[in-house]
Amino acid sequence: MITLDWEKANGLITTVVQDATTKQVLMVAYMNQESLAKTMATGETWFWSRSRKTLWHKGATSGNIQMVKTIAVDCDADTLLVTVDPAGPACHTGHISCFYRHYPEGKDLT
């Protein structure tokens, strides 16, 4: 059994959400033990809002829920990679992914 490192980030685990089909990274959020348990129980993503200090069910208001396909754990057991089948855009701006901007703007780093 894998033991997750909840202590490193004060009870939170960084969670990368990826589209199971396209492999596009959709968003990064945080889970606590309760949100991970709800995710496992419902098959839909739940996160911990650091700003509101509350659980949130992705898509509860927008309808853009994320159905979980797999959950992988990184080598340090402090980050999760959750692959999902999204019902719509992941970003609150309406973009498919929260990673729709590039830095620096309009420039390649190569």
Curated annotation (Swiss-Prot):
GO terms for biological process: L-histidine biosynthetic process. Its EC number is 3.5.4.19. The keyword Coiled coil does not apply. It is found in: Cytoplasm. Pathway: Amino-acid biosynthesis; L-histidine biosynthesis; L-histidine from 5-phospho-alpha-D-ribose 1-diphosphate: step 3/9. Mg(2+) binds at residues 74, 76, 78. GO terms for cellular component: cytoplasm. It catalyses: 1-(5-phospho-beta-D-ribosyl)-5'-AMP + H2O = 1-(5-phospho-beta-D-ribosyl)-5-[(5-phospho-beta-D-ribosylamino)methylideneamino]imidazole-4-carboxamide. Its main location: cytoplasm. Zn(2+) binds at residues 75, 91, 98. SUPFAM superfamilies: HisI-like. The keyword Cytoplasm applies. Keywords: Amino-acid biosynthesis, Cytoplasm, Histidine biosynthesis, Hydrolase, Magnesium, Metal-binding, Zinc. It is an enzyme of class 3 (hydrolase). Homodimer. HAMAP family: HisI (MF_01021). Belongs to the PRA-CH family. This is Phosphoribosyl-AMP cyclohydrolase. It comes from Lacticaseibacillus paracasei (strain ATCC 334 / BCRC 17002 / CCUG 31169 / CIP 107868 / KCTC 3260 / NRRL B-441) (Lactobacillus paracasei).
